[in-house]
Amino acid sequence: MDNKRLYNGNLSNIPEVIDPGITIPIYEEDIRNDTRMNTNARSVRVSDKRGRSSSTSPQKIGSYRTRAGRFSDTLTNLLPSISAKLHHSKKSTPVVVVPPTSSTPDSLNSTTYAPRVSSDSFTVATPLSLQSTTTRTRTRNNTVSSQITASSSLTTDVGNATSANIWSANAESNTSSSPLFDYPLATSYFEPLTRFKSTDNYTLPQTAQLNSFLEKNGNPNIWSSAGNSNTDHLNTPIVNRQRSQSQSTTNRVYTDAPYYQQPAQNYQVQVPPRVPKSTSISPVILDDVDPASINWITANQKVPLVNQISALLPTNTISISNVFPLQPTQQHQQNAVNLTSTSLATLCSQYGKVLSARTLRGLNMALVEFSTVESAICALEALQGKELSKVGAPSTVSFARVLPMYEQPLNVNGFNNTPKQPLLQEQLNHGVLNYQLQQSLQQPELQQQPTSFNQPNLTYCNPTQNLSHLQLSSNENEPYPFPLPPPSLSDSKKDILHTISSFKLEYDHLELNHLLQNALKNKGVSDTNYFGPLPEHNSKVPKRKDTFDAPKLRELRKQFDSNSLSTIEMEQLAIVMLDQLPELSSDYLGNTVIQKLFENSSNIIRDIMLRKCNKYLTSMGVHKNGTWVCQKIIKMANTPRQINLVTSGVSDYCTPLFNDQFGNYVIQGILKFGFPWNSFIFESVLSHFWTIVQNRYGSRAVRACLEADSIITQCQLLTITSLIIVLSPYLATDTNGTLLITWLLDTCTLPNKNLILCDKLVNKNLVKLCCHKLGSLTVLKILNLRGGEEEALSKNKIIHAIFDGPISSDSILFQILDEGNYGPTFIYKVLTSRILDNSVRDEAITKIRQLILNSNINLQSRQLLEEVGLSSAGISPKQSSKNHRKQHPQGFHSPGRARGVSVSSVRSSNSRHNSVIQMNNAGPTPALNFNPAPMSEINSYFNNQQVVYSGNQNQNQNGNSNGLDELNSQFDSFRIANGTNLSLPIVNLPNVSNNNNNYNNSGYSSQMNPLSRSVSHNNNNNTNNYNNNDNDNNNNNNNNNNNNNNNNNNNNNSNNSNNNNNNDTSLYRYRSYGY
């Protein structure tokens, strides 16, 4: 734009002609020198015509849709009246040369570039610029026809307006108060308040509502001819019309044409009554805002998960990290001035109009909202990687979005009476959930917070919880049983050396000392979100002819694919692209071209290219396109010079690369360089071990390094393996860290690894691991190891540590059972698996039963109780051995259904599921007492039950006999010679009822197996009693047997009418096998 004149970096004096069919840019010519200013109008016009004919066609703005031909011909043919007025205005318009102002922009503003909007320019200011006193903005609806016709009706003596200065009247600025500081360079910061003159502005507003709105906000003189007018009238000055206005067909297209074609009138605007949401047009500037008070999302990965989003299109809002407060915040006193957000708004105002600027509490982040998306894009490109708030802490700028908050209607009486809503609805409305730990569960609970009247959004009163630790997996929600963070390298150095010596392998002591010393002195970046410097973007430098844009890159890629370029041409191309090499490496087309150049260039050219981009290898390696170039560079590096250049550019950022999705492949590629080039990788792992292994990608990258046993040295393998064993309790309880424990147990080939690991787990950590859901899986994995002597020894060491020892509250078994989270479940898994031998299992069940009956353990695991033969209800604490052992409560849903043996018991004892004997009685409820039997005498799944009926009844001590031996003998008699067991009938309990007569009426109704006959058995040993056998089925056979020890005794005591019955029925379960 050599021949185009700019007015103080503004295109306000460049009129436009917008026609439905064509769009034509109109420019005004530059004044070549100062002598031409004094020539007459005719000479100026002749010289301008010559200049236009000799110059090339002007560069067109990107927003115009069509090309314009010859400007003069097109303008004359389409709009003759406008062309005449334009030439008339050039004849009578003197050019005013204004020297540059003394105010200069600061260094930061001089290096940044404004967005490409219709009111801004990219041309750098010159020492002598043509400055106009017009308003710096104009609306797009101000067409050329409307502007010229409006200017032709004005005289030069009304105010200070001339025909050349048609946008404003004078240079008097608005002096309305602003809550912020003075921003001389913020040309679009307070546009509605500062760009309109108070008295002599002849440009009509676009809508009448804006005039009324501004007058109601403390500026009554906008667009008003009278300074003391406080009404909502649109007052225009009285002007002299020298000639009639020319009509144009283009005026009919626009809605504002009647305002410019008709005489201005004084009329009152009828505005519907409404209450504006905000009475201030200035941007919202807030410091130390609670992140939960606004509903916002961003693509930055440093924010809490509730505010993260994987992909976000460009928006008008950006999030800036590493924004620290400029002044200390007092706990009991609010800051009088928002210094941080105000300075941030000042900085961002040069890229466009700022609507709001907020700094978030506890996150060191800020949200800046612009009026347009283009302003946000420009600010993101300019501020990316800059040290905005603190030296050494570059800021990461990402797109963000502030979503509307759901606000419930306020309650006059208070906020506690708000109606309850479902949890999912509250989550959608507010987006904040607090997790409260209750034993083993983390139940989500919504924080009900009142609405704040200080901010327009919904705020929260007591935000005390940082949501950055919020995880999605159930294992991650479980807290760590050990104090965090784990011991550092300096604290665990002795343990590492002791573990290395336990392997009893030979290694290089000098290499080990060198590795540990460098790891202790490691000064690499520990921030996993900082990836080093970024290459300069193309938009920040002046555009040159040799810039490689997308069409050129696409053409080069076609030439590479067709092998049409020679080696010399490729090397020449590499030298030409040298300045843009880091930037093109991250381009979706440029990265393929750079890879081809590294593949086909000589070592000298590769060295030159590496020296240019080695400091950007980290930022390239974490980019989805640049990582391919970075891996290609590592693959093609084959000389010591090239290897040194690659390692020097990556060594300081090893930890961020480990934890990145694409950067971890860069580390694995450098690993092949071997010792000593890859030593910095293991030094970084030792120095930042817990930071790396907690990450999803970091733990897998460490495992990949350990599996490359052909590349790494014996010392490096021993050091990392020893550190894994030392921190194994922490790794076993972490979702990503447990991958290294699995590698150690399954893949590692070091001797005695299992025994060394068991010593570390058993020593003071076994109880916490067994009671942790994820940690117990590691213990079970060790117990299920199959192999040689080492695996057996490690398994026995854990089993003896758990089940050996005294039966007391200090034992490991008691502590595991007493833990209400996951400890009983772990014991149940150990008992039901094939880990234990039969003898060890029986001893373990006996010990568990004794602990449960003789201690205060409130065991809630029904499966474990059934596995050891106890009931899941009715176990009272501190039961002595004199009390009888209880069995399952016989409460059934239907009379014909009975509860049977548990599934685990059936599976472990190879028995068939039978129904338990049913009890139906019309008399008092029977009380169940159980006599415990030793494990050696009776199977734990068969229970000797004793039914005693309550009432005015006395137990007959003489009639009781030991039925256990008889039951055992009967079980033995039910075997056939070949060892096959028979299915026995299931006998129901008798229905015992007492009547007014002094005799016992016992009705026996039995239900036989479907394959056997129905038989009722009445057993009586006392011949002095009256026995009445009433059966519902008269066809049943009644057999009187004296085999069982069931005695019905009628004893006469002092109460003549009392009937004392002692029914000592020995109940048992029968072993039942399939037919």
UniProtKB/Swiss-Prot annotation:
Keyword field contains Signal: no
GO biological process: nuclear-transcribed mRNA catabolic process, deadenylation-dependent decay
Region (Disordered): 38-68, 93-112, 874-931, 997-1075
First-listed, main subcellular location of the protein, grouped into a coarse class: cytoplasm
Location(s), subcellular: Cytoplasm
PUM-HD domain mapped to chain residues: 511-872
Keyword Repeat: yes
CDD domains: RRM_ScJSN1_like
Origin superkingdom: Eukaryota
Coiled coil feature spans: none
Biased composition (Low complexity): 93-105, 901-916, 997-1009, 1018-1063
GO molecular function, one term: mRNA binding
Positions carrying Phosphoserine: S72, S198, S872, S876
Assigned keywords, A-Z: Cytoplasm, Phosphoprotein, Repeat, RNA-binding
Gene Ontology CC: cytoplasm; P-body
Occurrences of domain RRM (ranges): 316-402
Any single Pfam family the record assigns to this protein: PUF
Repeat (Pumilio) residue spans along the chain: 574-611, 612-647, 649-683, 684-719, 722-758, 760-800
Miscellaneous field: Present with 377 molecules/cell in log phase SD medium.
Known role: RNA-binding protein involved in post-transcriptional regulation. Negatively regulates expression of COX17 by binding to the 3'-UTR of COX17 mRNA. Promotes decay of COX17 mRNA by enhancing its rate of deadenylation and subsequent turnover. Predominantly binds to mRNAs encoding membrane-associated proteins with roles in transmembrane transport and vesicular trafficking.
Protein name per the record: mRNA-binding protein PUF2
Lineage, broadest ranks: Eukaryota, Fungi, Dikarya, Ascomycota, Saccharomycotina
The gene coding this protein: PUF2
